[in-house]
From Swiss-Prot:
Organism encoding this protein: Mus musculus
Domain of life: Eukaryota
Sites bearing N-acetylserine, chain numbering: S2
GO biological process, one term: positive regulation of transcription by RNA polymerase II
Protein encoded by which gene: Gabpb1
Keyword Transcription regulation attributed: yes
Keyword set, alphabetical order: Acetylation, ANK repeat, Nucleus, Repeat, Transcription, Transcription regulation
Chain positions found as N6-acetyllysine: K69, K340, K369
Main location: nucleus
UniProt name for this protein: GA-binding protein subunit beta-1
Keyword Lyase annotated: no
TM regions (residue ranges): none
GO MF, one example: transcription cis-regulatory region binding
Modifications after synthesis and translation: Acetylated by EP300/p300. Deacetylated by SIRT7, promoting heterotetramerization and activity.
Amino acid sequence: MSLVDLGKKLLEAARAGQDDEVRILMANGAPFTTDWLGTSPLHLAAQYGHFSTTEVLLRAGVSRDARTKVDRTPLHMAASEGHANIVEVLLKHGADVNAKDMLKMTALHWATEHNHQEVVELLIKYGADVHTQSKFCKTAFDISIDNGNEDLAEILQIAMQNQINTNPESPDTVTIHAATPQFIIGPGGVVNLTDETGVSAVQFGNSSTSVLATLAALAEASAPLSNSSETPVVATEEVVTAESVDGAIQQVVSSGGQQVITIVTDGIQLGNLHSIPTSGMGQPIIVTMPDGQQVLTVPATDIAEETVISEEPPAKRQCMEIIESRVECAEIEEREALQKQLDEANREAQKYRQQLLKKEQEAEAYRQKLEAMTRIQTNKEAV
């Protein structure tokens, strides 16, 4: 049996999941060949869900990232069909989790397209990039939304947030450059974290006010920076425990002698403060508002001055970038569609030329046949 025949039989055995036949053929020297589409034995085993055959081929040294004519890898095949166990064994053997096919789609795209939640979770676990866009400018999250799969959309959204959140510090922070009493401002009130006897809070009322007014009240409520260790701040309202602080209040972050107060204001109206002991504050406070503005407040003893620095919100910038990216992708798709139509027209023209040539050859053969018959008839008549 020739090597070509051995290679063909290996492809058939891998497609059928015949482990013993695969071993025998490889022992007899069957090459790791492919079919006319570039499909290898490992592609077929992964596509048809033959786990043990996949392991046999991987141990034998078949390329784990082999490509078909459309650049699909065995991982693409397994993910598209929902074979989670084969996806995992391929990844354990070092398959490229972010490999892209001709449509620039990864295994995560295909698993999402076919609603294979277990495979999606497995790919994310092994480091699949959830932000990768296909040739059609679609992420896996976009595909899940298009398919109406809310469970997958939630999983992918969480994964996207986890991969983006590389900076642990919140952008909406207030930094005080001194060893001041530590406060948290949230919907539950202004909480003093330095009181050894407990955590004291000043409750907010129901009337609406700005974050700036709240910070001014905080400046009055806090002790002087130079004497912060001597005079703890205690509000005139009720004393609460740390467990009663609202869960939405962010934690104070200390770094390099700085205290960072994070104010949670999205969707919450802060009310007027109740009675608070008045005392000075020796340092200004810089607040980054949720809409991207930065406001500088100074103590009441200094000249009151506000400096508002407006900048484009990050969300708006990101939205504009997405829109520009999609417009660019749409233009690329249009050019590619036109090129595809041109190529198709050229192929049709070539096809008609070949058909015409064939007809001409047939006509010539028929003419010669008629001439031969005429000569034979003439000879008979002459005799």
